[in-house]
Structures are given as structure tokens and as C-alpha cells.
Amino acid sequence: ERLRAGLARGLSFPAARQAAGGADCLASPNDNLGVEYLRALPPGMEALTIPRRGAAHDGPAAGGFASASELRALLRAGRAAEADPYLPAPWSGEAASMAHIDRAVLARLRTMDEADWAALPDGGAAEGLPARLARSARTADSLEDFYARAKTKRYPHARLRRLALAAFLGLRAAERPPVAPYVRVLGLSGRGRALLRRMKETCALPVVVKPAQARALDGDARALFEAEARRTDLFGLCFPTARPCG
């Protein structure tokens, strides 16, 4: 009841939940995410919480640690030398940024009607959000302007960014699989290689390390991998020098 009252006052769900529960830990975005992970855990799994050391979420470097947000900001600003102490190896590449696809994303948003917005994951149809998003997209002259026009206490910046990106990538709630049809390995350490060998024998799902291994997938798994590959090609446009597909 207190949660519903907070939402009725225009608070975002995390803020309304914190006010209803009176829990200081729910003031942190990462702690809110942790609560959702705990809710999703199947019976029999036990969670282990580990205190965060050093930099806070989106905060400056502290205690020998830097947040991912801080590191991305340094790299995008061309200040790689300041980021290097917090990285496993010196940075020598380009940093991706949605600023490079601002017009492309906005072009997609301007073509969308309320039904298109409602079809997105977390599109907020029950809250009346699609009408606000469609109206904001038609009048905004940049992505930041779109976020500023659409933002309210209930619809925070982070949610709007996710919706804009989902729209650009063509994601739809109805097409989201209920469970992951395969495991995609993006990187691993020496210990990870040992675990990978064991996974190939014990994992209930196909394990994909190299794109060529996706040829063995079929049905929904193959369709999802192909969709993932197409969206990765779009990510290549986020670099200062656009990268080719593949």
C-alpha cells in the first residue's frame, strides 16, 4: 500500500520501494539491482553479498578503485593515462559512445507511434508512458533533449536511455525468450578456461565461445544469436571511426 502511494505521487519504482521499506540500502542503484537478482533466484540457490570497496556507483575513483562510469568518461575524453592505473592493461583503442549515433537513434524514435513504444521491453503501456515518449520524440532535437522532455520523477533518465536503445535496436517484449537458449562466453581468465572445459561436459545449454560455433544452434537459439550479431553490427557505429559489420 505504501509502495502504491509512492508511485501515485510520481516516484520512480526504486524510490517508492525505498520509501515504503525504509531501507537505506535501497538508495543505491546497484543494491536495487541486487534485490531484483535475489527475487529471481530459484529455490535452493544461496546468495553471497560482498561489500563494494572504493568508488561508489557513478562516483570518482577512491581507495584504488574506479567505477566503470568514471573509466568510460576518462577514455571518451582522451584521458587514457588517468584510467590506466585502474585497468588490467594500458588502453590503446577507441572508446564507444552513443553520441556518435545520436541522430540515427533520434531518427528511429521519430518514426515510432504509441503502439511501437508500448511494444518495447518495459515500455510502460499501463502507466501511459508511450504517449509521453512519442510526443517527446517528435519535438526533441537531440537524444539529450528527448530525455529531458520525457523525464519525470517516475520515469528516470536511466529507464529512458534503455528504452531509446531498445527502440534503436528493434527489441520487442514479445520476442524476448523466457530463458536463455545458449551461453555466450565473451572473455575468460586462466581459471575460466578450466571452468569452460568442465562446462562443455556438464552445461545443459550450448556454450558459444566463437561465432562459428553458432552454426550448431537451431530454432530459437539460432534466431537469437543472429539478432545479437545484427545488433553488434550497429554497436560498431558507436566508435569515432565506424567499424564494419562482422
Enumerate the predicted regions with their spans.
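Active-site cores that bind ATP or allylic diphosphates and position pyrophosphate for catalysis
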Residues: E1-G246
